[in-house]
A protein has these predicted regions:
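Surface-exposed acidic/polar loop and edge beta-strand patches at domain peripheries
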Residues: 1-111, 115, 119-168
């Protein structure tokens, strides 16, 4: 099963085999948030950024507070067959996100399409960055490339200084 938020976000907030535990983090208690003065100065008083968890579309390069757009408003969406299109409000930073999630006719596969449009009128350099926040203590398996690239790498992993990938 898959659960997607439309009252905020959007986020894929739950992804699991029916009757099994959610593989994604769902921050129900809103423990992970940013309501710093710097964020409020930029986005407005009363604005708070919540991680919410799950899978979301972000932009790179990351910068503070610009990247931490409080996406706490309802999302425009349409459903057609096994496909949902989600369009949140344009951000103060001039980004218009569009996400399309397509469910396979059979099995548990979900195709994700992400798009960021620059609606600011300014020239902006960025890249779409899809983040998936997994639940602590779980095991995730990611398909690995089998491409024969000779002496060149065929897979890449990126970790931030605060990432902990230990099995402890």
């Amino acid at each position: 099963s898959i659960i997607i938020t439309v009252e905020v976000g959007p986020r894929i907030i739950s992804y699991c085999l029916n009757g099994h535990e959610n593989m994604l983090l769902e921050d129900v208690g809103r423990e992970f948030k940013d309501d710093s003065q710097e964020l409020r100065d930029y986005f407005g008083e009363g604005r708070t950024w919540y991680i919410y968890g799950g899978h979301r579309l972000w932009s790179s390069p990351e910068s503070y507070p610009h990247s931490y757009v409080p996406d706490n408003e309802p999302v425009e969406y349409t459903v057609s067959g096994g496909e949902i299109t989600l369009i949140p409000p344009a951000t103060r930073t001039g980004q218009q996100h569009r996400l399309i999630y397509r469910l396979a006719d059979e099995g548990s596969e979900v195709e994700l399409f992400h798009e960021i449009r620059n609606v600011s009128g300014a020239i902006v350099t960025l890249a779409p960055w899809a983040l998936t926040v997994c639940a602590a203590g779980g095991v995730e398996i990611f398909p690995q490339s089998q491409a024969d690239n000779g002496l060149l790498s065929n897979r890449r992993n990126v970790f931030w200084s605060y990432s902990d990938i230990s099995d402890d």
